[in-house]
């Protein structure tokens, strides 16, 4: 059995990784690490794990935990990883990191959008961007994998076939995306309290959300030219799920059916990418609890514009599910191993 340690196991992303891996046929969780809950059973913190997975949480001490696992998943806040990842690298461990620290090719871009100094620029050469559908070979050979953000995953995969085939105006792409509240993590900040979120729908970080730069980086690599996007995130009063509505002006005449066939061909070997037939559009209830992304589109002939819609679970394909997909790659397993569960629907 392959062995994995989860550092930051008691946050929403961490515990979702536990939920997915505890029943994985080929990967064994050998350490769960939580600074705040060290010495307590994780099932005491999350009672849904009672009688299923009751491992005691380790303290965050790399010297003590390093030998427990071959690969470590770090689910820590941005910037905090610099206290952990270099030590794991020194001990020869591979890491799947959920912070933004290893998602960027450029230190300058990271520091501009995160308004922080990158604490580990010397390690970027060891890293790969963890979106398997676009960077599978790089992931196989990397020591550190920067797990993508949820909004970028939902947006990049929705746009990739159009951008790669140079079918849209690359200077006028608009992305409106809405996320469930779990995307903010397990914290007590006022904007995420029940009375602030319930029966409320709001935009935030308009024109300056840090995921803008992540989306632009990956689309620019695909297009082999600089791409800029207008990205606006929204908060939806639901626990999990994400829906992106993307507008792009076509630079040639294409029908809805032609573009759907293009998408199906582009993603024909990608198990987790589901391209919907003409007349059908994604909904969050179809993907919540799964690692799938559903993509649908409509061409507005009047404006010669394509509207692409994509849906993921922000905790699934947007975080924990994608991390398990990456772990499968690192261990030489089929990517769908342990991830074939459908969405909850209800």
Swiss-Prot record:
Question: Keyword NADP: yes or no?
Answer: yes
Q: Which NCBIfam families match?
A: argC (TIGR01850)
Q: Per its record, how is this protein called by name?
A: N-acetyl-gamma-glutamyl-phosphate reductase
Q: What does this protein do?
A: Catalyzes the NADPH-dependent reduction of N-acetyl-5-glutamyl phosphate to yield N-acetyl-L-glutamate 5-semialdehyde.
Q: Which GO terms describe its molecular function?
A: N-acetyl-gamma-glutamyl-phosphate reductase activity; NAD binding; NADP+ binding
The active site lies at 150
Q: Which residues form a coiled coil?
A: none
**Which Enzyme Commission numbers does its entry carry?**
1.2.1.38
What top-level class of enzyme does the UniProt entry assign?
Answer: oxidoreductase
Lineage of the organism: Bacteria, Bacillati, Bacillota, Clostridia, Eubacteriales
Pfam families xrefs? Semialdhyde_dh, Semialdhyde_dhC_1
Question: GO BP, one example?
Answer: L-arginine biosynthetic process
* Record pathway: Amino-acid biosynthesis; L-arginine biosynthesis; N(2)-acetyl-L-ornithine from L-glutamate: step 3/4
The reaction(s) annotated as catalysed by this protein in its Swiss-Prot or TrEMBL entry are: N-acetyl-L-glutamate 5-semialdehyde + phosphate + NADP(+) = N-acetyl-L-glutamyl 5-phosphate + NADPH + H(+)
């Amino acid at each position: 059995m392959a062995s994995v340690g989860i550092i930051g196991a008691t946050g929403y992303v961490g515990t979702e990784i536990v939920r997915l891996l505890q029943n994985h046929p080929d990967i064994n969780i050998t350490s769960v690490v939580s600074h705040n809950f060290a010495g307590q059973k994780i099932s005491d913190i999350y009672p849904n794990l009672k009688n299923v997975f009751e491992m005691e949480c380790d303290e965050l001490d790399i010297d003590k935990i390093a030998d427990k696992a071959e690969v470590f998943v770090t689910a820590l806040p941005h910037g905090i990883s610099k206290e952990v990842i270099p030590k794991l690298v020194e001990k020869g461990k591979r890491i799947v990191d959920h912070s933004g620290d290893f998602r960027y090719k450029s230190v300058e871009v990271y520091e501009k959008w995160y308004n922080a100094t990158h604490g580990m620029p010397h390690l970027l050469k060891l890293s790969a961007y963890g979106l398997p559908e676009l960077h599978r070979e790089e992931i196989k050979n990397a020591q550190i994998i920067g797990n993508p953000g949820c909004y970028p995953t939902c947006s990049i995969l929705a746009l990739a076939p159009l951008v790669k085939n140079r079918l849209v105006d690359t200077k006028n792409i608009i992305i409106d995306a809405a996320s469930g509240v779990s995307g903010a993590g397990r914290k007590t900040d006022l904007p995420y309290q029940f009375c602030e979120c319930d029966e409320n729908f709001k935009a935030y970080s308009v024109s300056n959300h840090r995921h803008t730069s992540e989306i632009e980086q990956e689309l620019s690599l695909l297009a082999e030219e600089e791409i800029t996007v207008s990205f606006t995130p929204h908060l939806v009063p639901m626990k999990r799920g994400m829906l992106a509505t993307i507008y792009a002006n076509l630079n040639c005449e294409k029908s809805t059916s032609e573009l759907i066939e293009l998408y199906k061909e582009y993603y024909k070997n990608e198990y987790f990418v589901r391209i919907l037939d003409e007349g059908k559009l994604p909904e969050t209830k179809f993907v919540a609890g799964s690692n799938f992304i559903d993509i649908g589109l409509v061409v507005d002939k009047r404006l010669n514009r394509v509207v692409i819609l994509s849906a993921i679970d922000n905790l699934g394909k947007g975080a924990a599910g994608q991390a398990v997909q990456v772990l499968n790659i690192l261990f030489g397993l089929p990517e769908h191993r342990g991830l074939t569960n459908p969405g909850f629907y209800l």
